[in-house]
Design a protein with these regions (language model features):
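Alpha-helix boundary/capping residues
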Residues: 11, 44-47
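Short N-terminal segments immediately surrounding and downstream of signal-peptide cleavage
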Residues: 22-37
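Sec/Tat signal peptide C-region and signal peptidase I cleavage site
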Residues: 16-20
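Amphipathic N-proximal alpha-helical interface segments
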Residues: 21-24, 47-117, 123-191
């Protein structure tokens, strides 16, 4: 029941009163692209949980947290590591569907259709593939692409049992709000 309620809240928070064409109009747990992370937690809290990127070409740092969330089981936020204002560059929300990929994909489809019905002129790109970090795991992605190249990714991740046990991961649904500038930076860093 908690997951059903979470999906309904998720859908409602992704909707906007008018047909939006700006990715900054979308929120995850009340947080939007362009907000300062300092509006949601102290600098000390950020420094305790921040993660530096392993790839030196990546300028964005990340936090993941699970405290005081209403809709998601976890939230991830990225910002430029040199930005002292911690302006949010991208964010994602995670809902766990461990060993329940059928319901994960069902909710993914519901969210995708709801967003498509709420926002016109989005291009849908669906992909399925093997996870790079888990050769026996899979991903199922619906990317909703704005005319300017911004993306809302709705992804189901299905990890193998050995990978789950080793890394303490669970299968999950992840909704990511990804501006084109952020996506371009990652694409360039991994060339």
């Amino acid at each position: 029941m908690k997951k059903l309620l979470a999906i309904l809240v998720l859908i409602l928070t992704l909707q906007t009163p008018s047909l939006a064409d700006d990715i900054r109009d979308f929120q995850i747990e009340g947080i939007s692209i362009g907000d300062s992370l300092l509006d949601y937690m102290s600098e000390e809290e950020i420094k305790e949980i921040q993660r530096k990127p392993a790839n030196k070409k990546i300028k964005y740092w990340r936090i993941s947290y699970r405290k005081n969330l209403k809709t998601y089981d976890a939230v991830q936020i990225w910002w430029d590591g040199k930005d002292k204002n911690y302006k949010i560059a991208s964010l994602g929300g995670i809902i766990e569907f461990d060993n329940d990929m059928n319901n994960c994909k069902k909710k993914q489809n519901e969210i995708t259709i709801d967003i498509q019905n709420s926002i016109k002129n989005l291009r849908l790109n669906k992909q399925t593939g093997q996870l790079s970090q888990d050769k026996d795991g899979n991903f199922y992605q619906s990317a909703l692409i704005f005319e300017n190249g911004d993306i809302i990714n709705i992804q189901c991740y299905e990890f193998s049992k050995p990978y789950k046990n080793k890394h303490n991961y669970v299968d999950n649904l992840k909704v990511m709000i990804v501006p084109k500038k952020f996506d371009d930076h990652y694409q360039e860093a991994y060339k």
